[in-house]
Amino acid sequence: YFQNTSSKPLFKVNHVIYKDHRKSEMTYSEIIENVNLGYNEKLPPMDWKLISEKKKILDYECSKAETFFGGRKFIAWYTNQIPINEGPYKFSGLPGLILEVSDDKNNFHYQLLAIIKKEQNILYKNDVHLTEKKKLIETKMNLIKKITKSDVKVNPLEKK
């Protein structure tokens, strides 16, 4: 279970990213007004610099790594104890699971809070209604405008 603990979260992040490393592609999906909308794009290349610094996250010994992505410097903490080369959002490619990643200004900060085995339905990529990235963003922004203009006191984008 990852949480975005950035210094400027606008609202709760509730998206799923499907990564296909063989094709260097990803599908971003998000449920907007009860529709699972998504778009495809190329996975960004991550050129990681491994750093000898260590710290514990939960009960895992983690190592530090840095990369530049989207015009920002990102710092990641990964563990070899879980040998999966994945992480939150678009981040991957380290020799273990990324448990924490943030930019140097803390505008983006994903942190592992727990590893929970759950019995729940998994949304599969073929359940996503594909559109263009621009159209998904436009649909999301229209929903946000609609919510901010209404008298709704609860954030409907947040799960209870």
Predicted regions and their residues:
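Extended soluble regions of mature proteins
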Residues: 1-160
